[in-house]
Amino acid sequence: MEATPQGKVSDWLGLVYNKQGSVIGYDKTGPLAMGTEEEVTALLAWRFYDAGMPWNEAVVKVRELNALAMIEVERCRPAHPLPGLYDFLVSCSRAGIALGVVTSDTTAETLKHLEWMGIRNYFCSIVGRDRVGKGKPDPEMVTLALREMRISTEECILIGDSNGDMIMAKRAGLQAAIGIAGDITSGKEYLLDADVIVTGYSDITVQLA
């Protein structure tokens, strides 16, 4: 009999569901917000191992399930820009501001998602977890992105939605760390190291010096 993890997925992945059973959010302090692909794979594999499956089989099982999930992702392409993001990118482009992406996702997947949203060309540096030795909140990804964008730490502001992003910005010595949260009050509970918290890109104004 195949081992099956017990308990709700929402309990150990931090997923939030609506009454219809659809995922509508996730814990901003949890693994989906800050974990790398390898870390999330290990977390899921542990659940199978805890249910009695040998570790090597558990890892293979998770990778198989991930492959099936990615087929559906490729079909649906569920990547959409946050409200206000496109206008923000256009404003930055017109102002001559260099933009980069640093993410716990793989570089290839990130590039794909940016292409789906039609915003790939706005970024001159894309740094995924696979391009560095250490992930967030270590500043290595930021350091690489800055080098590729040819700007200094004093010229850079980081915008992110997890406190891991905020800590990474601090450790890199950036000018500021801006946290994005749907609600300012709840954002203050987990974006503890943000210099400023906004509800979205529409709250950020780009002005020429």
Give residue ranges: language-model regions:
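Pocket-edge positions in alpha/beta enzyme catalytic cores
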Residues: 29-32, 77, 133-134, 196
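Conserved beta-strand/loop elements of the cytosolic catalytic core of P-type E1-E2 ATPases, chiefly
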Residues: 78-82, 103
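A metal-dependent, Asp-based hydrolase signature
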Residues: 3-71, 83-86, 90-94
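Asp-based, Mg2+/Mn2+-dependent phosphohydrolase catalytic module
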Residues: 86-94, 106-209
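Surface-exposed cleft-lining segments at the edges of enzyme active sites
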Residues: 71-77
